[in-house]
């Protein structure tokens, strides 16, 4: 039987066993993570902004050199753009260079006339669009009103039909209405097999015969007459 569950009144203590006189010599194992890792100071190298290097640098001169280099780079691209702009401007014909033979009364001579013509055409287009928009709105409103009127008429017709069909007296008065049929509908169990099977048996001659029905058997009838009735 195990004794693991029993309480320990005398726990084990280190230093009392064989070779355990000195507790500091119990184990010679140690982890590599316990060793000293960073034992030397890291100094800044060249091009890492060391104090001596920063002290000997002339920041103003470096800034001026970078500005001059940026200006030279900008001026290098400027003549190309100016040349392309001048060439595009030179391609545009001037008004005084157009020969007199090409001048016509229908040709626009000023930009103001072009602007006036464009404004008039824009106004005409805006007016046409507004008129078309008003026409569309009017057609939609008429269509909506027509649908609402048809829906109301259909609802009224359905309501009148429900009123007339719900009252049998009103159905009889109408000449166009079909004749109402008050015949009682047959029950769902009118044609079942064992309905009214025992009806009229007492009037007939009682002969002992086998019936495949426990409720209509002779034994059941005698039992009911003897103990229940």
UniProtKB/Swiss-Prot annotation:
Residue positions where N6-acetyllysine is found in the record: 18
Gene Ontology CC: catalytic step 2 spliceosome; nucleus; Prp19 complex; spliceosomal complex; U2-type catalytic step 2 spliceosome
Composition bias, Basic and acidic residues: 52-84
Pfam family for this entry, one: Cwf_Cwc_15
Residue(s) carrying Phosphothreonine: 47, 110
Residue numbers bearing the Phosphoserine modification: 121
Biased composition (Acidic residues): 104-126
Chain segments annotated as coiled-coil in the UniProt record: 123-165
Family: Belongs to the CWC15 family.
Protein name, as recorded: Spliceosome-associated protein CWC15 homolog
Source organism of the structure: Rattus norvegicus (Rat)
This protein's encoding gene: Cwc15
